[in-house]
Amino acid sequence: MSVSLLRKGLDLLREERSGAESSSKKRNSSSKPKPCLSSSKTGMRKQLRRLKQQGLRHDQKATAKGRVIRSAVEEFKKQSAKDHLQQNLQYMLDSSSVTSKEVVDKILKQNRGRKAKDIEIKQHRQIKEKSVFSDADFKRFELEYFGSK
C-alpha cells in the first residue's frame, strides 16, 4: 500500500470523526436546519452540487481530476521537516544480507571490459628463440665454411 493512499484513508477517518462530533454538538444547539431539496426533478443535480460545495472553501475545491489544490511551499515544508537519518542508518546497519565474494566477483567481471578504458593491453611474451643448431654444429660450420685459422 502506498503512503499516499494511507494518508488519504487517515484523512477520511479524521474527517468522519470530526464530522460526527461536530454534528452531535450542532444538533443540540439551535442552528439552521439543512436546506431541503425540492421535489422537482429539473435542476436536482445542480442543487446537490451546490449543497456539497457549500462547506468547501474556495481555494480548497477539488480540481477536475479530484485533487485538492495545495501550496507547493507547504508540501516542501512538510517533507523537509522530517529527518530520516536515524531511520536510514538503522536500516543499513540491520541489513544482514551480505553477498558472497564469488557473486560479487562474477558481477564485477561481467561489467568490466565493456568500455575502452577497461580493456587490458595484452603484452606479448618475448620467447627466446632456441636454435635448431647446437654450438658444436656452429663450430663445424665455421671450420667448413671459413676454413681453419
Curated annotation (Swiss-Prot):
GO CC annotations, alphabetized: nucleolus; small-subunit processome
Q: Name one GO biological process term.
A: ribosomal small subunit biogenesis
Chief site of localization: nucleus
Q: Which Pfam families match?
A: AROS
- Entry keyword annotation includes Nucleus: yes
| Disulfide pairings | none
Record's compositionally biased regions (Low complexity): 30-41
Q: Give the quaternary structure.
A: Part of the small subunit (SSU) processome, composed of more than 70 proteins and the RNA chaperone small nucleolar RNA (snoRNA) U3.
* PANTHER family linked to this entry: ACTIVE REGULATOR OF SIRT1 (PTHR31454:SF2)
Query: Which protein is depicted?
Result: Active regulator of SIRT1
Q: Which gene encodes it?
A: rps19bp1
